[in-house]
């Protein structure tokens, strides 16, 4: 297919030329009714913030320009079908899981998944078969799923309908996806890939394996993260063994009927950009990331991991564009360095946790920006270094799963002070955001270690979300008796 084409963009440009008089929504009427919005966003933007109409197609039932854009995306990603999504990759992940499972079904998955996965299990009332990942002894981060762990889970749960894989994790760690696909398919299970952080795997060279390229059945891809489209835009990819018509039915259960043409056109334009220029763009990103990694490691006390941690299994590969920097030898938590960078140096990184800082590099970064980050980290070491601190060094605590997320979330519950929750079954999520990986999920027993982790995270300034009590002083737990 001709990847230079941008059918949604072309249709919007034609609409502007035709000067159609709008007696439909949105009510700002191409910006004329809201001049402040037009000044802020610009006429070019508000003039194409329009409603679905025949020349522009309909996202819920595409037959013309949106269908053409989806066909081009499928071709670019080497998938059987692609769905343009406007609810973020949360909506892509949830549609993927809901398409693969029915109530009561089991799914094999790592516990270090995004909350959207567990929310989908809660909605469909599926049973999670968690594989607890190993943690790296120095970095404290959770790794990928080991092949033997998945093999044992498949043998113990032959009734499972699917295996879900993070490709990569938030920290850039990749499992042995080709082996997992082969193993799952041999057991007649689908393979679902959360590729929220792996768009570039499809277009760059010297990248980890992309899910569709190794035979996975579905993949949720965050185009807005490393693909250049607008925030909240995403693509759901399916393989030849998946009923795409059924998937669209599932998508339409929750997806808006007022799909934003700003988001849709950004997907169309960005897909073309990746297909035409992706190799060159990501070659430069890799060069910048490798340079930054080397410079940061030369500062001292920081550790930006590289290929030395690859072990052929739990770390089968890693995403070189991710700049994950361990800060513990500095005597500072990752979230503390994150805050200093933002507050003192006007540098916004992706996130900081208890031991690590993540800088997200893309083709939008300039060499001078990378130099500024490296220089700031060096100065932070000089100004704030305090070695010998007693630091919490693990980012993942294996949960004790007591009941399904669905059952726990809808059970009778009561609010209990955090300090008194040990041994109780949690009825809600607790997580740091970003990255949105639950510390606790509904149905998991609260342990003393988890309570200490939550208290420590709050003390270090992590943004904890999920509980009904936004201060996270109390947690909802299952009522006893």
How would you label these PLM feature ranges?
Residues 1-64, 435:
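N-terminal "arm"/small-domain region of PLP-dependent enzymes with the aminotransferase-like
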Residues 5-13, 17, 37, 61, ...:
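Conserved PLP-enzyme active-site core in the AAT-like
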Residues 46-91:
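Conserved N-terminal alpha-helix of the aminotransferase class I/II PLP-enzyme fold
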Residues 56, 83-85, 163-166, 324, ...:
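Short glycine-rich or small-residue beta-strand-to-loop segments that form or flank ligand, phosphate
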Residues 57-61, 280, 438-442:
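A short N-terminal beta->alpha junction/helix N-cap motif
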Residues 84, 130-132, 221, 351, ...:
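Structural signal for conserved beta-strand scaffold positions within catalytic alpha/beta enzyme cores
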Residues 291-467:
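Conserved C-terminal alpha-helix-loop-beta "cap" of PLP-dependent enzymes
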Residues 463-481:
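Charge-dense polyanion-binding interfaces
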């Amino acid at each position: 297919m001709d990847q230079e084409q941008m059918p949604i963009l072309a249709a919007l440009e034609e609409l502007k030329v035709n000067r159609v008089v709008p007696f439909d929504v949105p009510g700002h009427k191409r910006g004329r009714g809201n001049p402040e919005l037009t000044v802020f966003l610009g006429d070019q933007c508000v003039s194409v913030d329009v409603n679905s109409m025949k020349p522009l197609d309909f996202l819920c039932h595409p037959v013309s320009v949106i269908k053409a854009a989806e066909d081009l995306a499928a071709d670019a990603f080497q998938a059987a079908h692609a769905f343009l999504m406007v609810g973020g990759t949360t909506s892509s992940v949830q549609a993927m899981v809901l398409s693969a499972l029915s109530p009561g079904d089991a799914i094999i998955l790592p516990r270090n998944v995004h909350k959207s996965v567990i929310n989908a299990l809660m909605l469909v009332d599926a049973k999670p078969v968690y594989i607890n990942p190993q943690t790296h002894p120095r970095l404290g981060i959770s790794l990928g799923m080991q092949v033997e762990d998945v093999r044992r889970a498949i043998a113990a749960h032959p009734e499972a309908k699917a295996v879900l894989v993070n490709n990569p994790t938030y920290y850039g760690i990749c499992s042995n996806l080709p082996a997992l696909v082969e193993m799952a398919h041999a057991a007649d299970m689908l393979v679902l890939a959360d590729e929220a952080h792996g768009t570039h795997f499809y277009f760059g060279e010297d990248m980890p394996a992309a899910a569709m390229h190794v035979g996975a059945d579905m993949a949720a891809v965050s185009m807005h993260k490393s693909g250049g489209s607008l925030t909240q835009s995403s693509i759901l990819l399916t393989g030849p063994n998946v009923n795409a018509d059924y998937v669209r039915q599932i998508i339409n259960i929750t997806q808006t009927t007022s799909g934003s043409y700003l988001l849709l056109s950004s997907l169309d334009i960005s897909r073309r950009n990746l297909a035409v220029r992706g190799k060159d763009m990501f070659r430069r990103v890799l060069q910048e990331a490798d340079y930054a990694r080397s410079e940061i490691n030369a500062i001292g006390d920081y550790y930006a991991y590289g290929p030395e941690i690859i072990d052929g299994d739990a770390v089968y590969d890693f995403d070189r564009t991710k700049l994950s920097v361990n800060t513990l030898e500095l005597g500072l938590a990752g979230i503390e360095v994150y805050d200093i960078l933002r507050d003192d140096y006007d540098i916004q990184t992706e996130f900081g946790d208890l031991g690590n800082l993540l800088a997200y590099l893309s083709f939008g970064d300039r060499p001078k920006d990378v130099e500024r980050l490296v220089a700031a980290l060096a100065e932070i070491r000089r100004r704030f270094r305090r070695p010998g601190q007693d630091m919490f060094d693990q980012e993942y605590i294996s949960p004790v799963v007591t009941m399904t997320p669905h059952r726990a979330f809808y059970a009778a519950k009561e609010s209990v002070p955090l300090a008194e929750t040990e041994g109780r079954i949690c009825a809600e999520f607790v997580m740091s955001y970003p990255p949105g990986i639950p510390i606790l999920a509904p149905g998991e027993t609260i342990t003393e270690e988890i309570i200490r982790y939550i208290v420590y995270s709050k003390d270090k300034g992590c943004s904890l979300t999920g509980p009904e009590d936004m201060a996270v002083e109390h947690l909802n737990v299952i009522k006893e008796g």
